[in-house]
């Protein structure tokens, strides 16, 4: 598993934990490791093979164990279990530029939006969006249009 793949998994874990309302320190730990991986040039598989995971800035014991699991098995049970707690649609919302965990949570919990199609319908209507202004609506509208273009 590449550094980029691990980074993306940890980024999604942090987002899902935020949606879930988890401990902010736990979320911050994952985001710190994500930032570390953005600048880390050494392949994590190499570090694992040499028992040097402690060189990853910000990685505590729990995160190092998760990295080891990903490197050795190619997947992470914790991640799979966490993903299963949320419908696919909410994860799709997180993939839209301009929609972070707080916005996705508001759309999902306040407006029961569970898919990109439902989001697009609401964005293009006159329905008020919870805790969002017209600028956010326009940014999301643009991001959805760009996603359609491919």
Predicted regions, residues:
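Double-stranded DNA-binding cores of transcription factors and transposases
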Residues: 3-39
